């Protein structure tokens, strides 16, 4: 590497090791990034993605104690030789949790902070503040307290702070991981605009469908090393994508499904529009209809026998006769500031159901959950769980009926070892010592944590801590598990592991309710979907029928999975509820 290179970023890292860790976090990483690129860094958990971001931004070695054997240049300048104040004009860095970067009393002060420290004239500072807030659509929040922002709003303010510095490079570590679909859309729309206007973007992202349409390149990491570094279409053209442990866009999965069955396309489609255009262009049947109902005509598609069920074997068919385990009747609630959170909500759930509660931020989902566990005492008679009126129960008693998993598992982990964390509830209930040992180890084994029994919980990965929180709840044998955003912060495999445990709990007779924005998980695991909007329940139906209500679900602020947009674009029957079914429908249309 030499100063004056045309690359904006050059990195040659032999190793990076945190002083408290026995193993290296990065090894043998070499990469360069040219001006104007949009680069996505992806990979499974603990693959070194965040550590690479720290090195590319100078956080390592300047702010985080780590041993770096290697060099990183940005704009021809060696980061090791610069003070952090000298790094700021070169690049901006967005952390996964935006609240960690906001510390002033108002949005105006937060966005002004960077330009003020560059000692710019007051007029220039004000111009930059207003221009950056206008770009992210946050002008009306100028005097809003930073502690009064939603997650999506806070992330847009952090982006505004970086824009006010006018650095040529932006590095973002999972910038939308904790946002709802609308918040994710806003973040990536803004990043796409910035890239079109000349900024170089480097973003860590696991949900590649969010960025596939405009990213130029993908860097795949595993075990601290870069194992793939390719243009995005070349990467998605690979036949071994399923071995990488990452989420693959449905458009790409469909491409490979058809290719394996003899339907070849010149390019891998990255968007729904490209799928439609590619089929029209590359298939041997020029009259193949792609936007009319003809492609699905005379091609029966019975509901697939997946976890979501269907009309012929409706998993909810016994709801009218089975006694409800949860009965919510005409529940309304307003917060002290007058905000109406719930408005005449009624809902019942039977034993053995797997129910997903979805909706945009502010729809009332979490408020409803808090009433189920007694954190917000409901009016008498409105919430009944297992025959008990929740308004008459203490939180401790309610927790025996409903086990609650927070979105952030660290809020409910407080013991010094993995074993003690799971055993805590049993000991509190005066369970005999031998039984505590037996049941705790069974729970740890089920959660694939038994080999970590003596480890401190905070040495575990986010996915392991999520499974630990579930194990400590499940071991108490509540009839109901209520899980808030089970996939937040998890990679594809970690999310699948956690959802597999929840499905195992349900299969054993338990009832599972999840609050989520991840519609891919909903379609794979949930039997039933409850759609909330503005404090009311707008839809309550089997998962397999959600496609029939495409417009209503979209209007509720829920970002639908890519395969649902494919079904709509190709005018397939609503029961076509996964990529293989879409592929078979397309093949049937081609054969006619």
Where are these regions (language model features)?
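Helix-to-loop junction immediately C-terminal to a conserved catalytic motif
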Residues: 57, 373
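Conserved ABC transporter NBD signature motif
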Residues: 65-77, 381-389, 398
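H-loop/switch region of ABC-family ATPase nucleotide-binding domains
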Residues: 205-206, 516-517
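Catalytic Walker B motif of ABC-type/P-loop ATPase nucleotide-binding domains
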Residues: 170-173, 481-484
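Conserved ABC ATPase "signature" C-loop
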Residues: 223-224, 534-535
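Conserved ABC ATPase signature
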Residues: 145-149, 153, 456-460
